[in-house]
Amino acid sequence: MGSNILYIEDNPDNMMLVKRALESRGYTLLEARTGIEGVAAAEKNELDLILLDINLPDIDGYEVARRLRGSVKPTLAYTPIIAITANALKGDAEKALAAGCDVYMSKPINIRELWARVEAFVPAPNQ
């Protein structure tokens, strides 16, 4: 498989949808179900991109992004983070960007938009 992408998401349906969509393009998707688990996975693995849900059961995605950007692992300061969230209120995108996310997407997930956003940072291995 190809480039490593970490998806931090507690909803199994969203996880499966994104996993299938990205693996069909040749990406390898690593999974984390909580914010704490996601930070640990990011610090343990070599990643090309992080997809981040904002509403997580332990710490929210904003805090996850801040921890990733401040990690002792230097590459996490520059690893692209795409926030994918149901939060679509005014100011949510700005809050995600201020926390360290590079791009903000709202749910429901549009697969073509997801591919375009991901491929802007990491070319698809199968394309």
Label for each model-derived stretch:
Residues 26-33, 41, 105:
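Short hydrophobic/Thr-rich beta-strand motif most characteristic of the beta2 strand and flanking loop
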Residues 53, 85:
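Active-site residues of response regulator receiver
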Residues 9:
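Conserved acidic carboxylate
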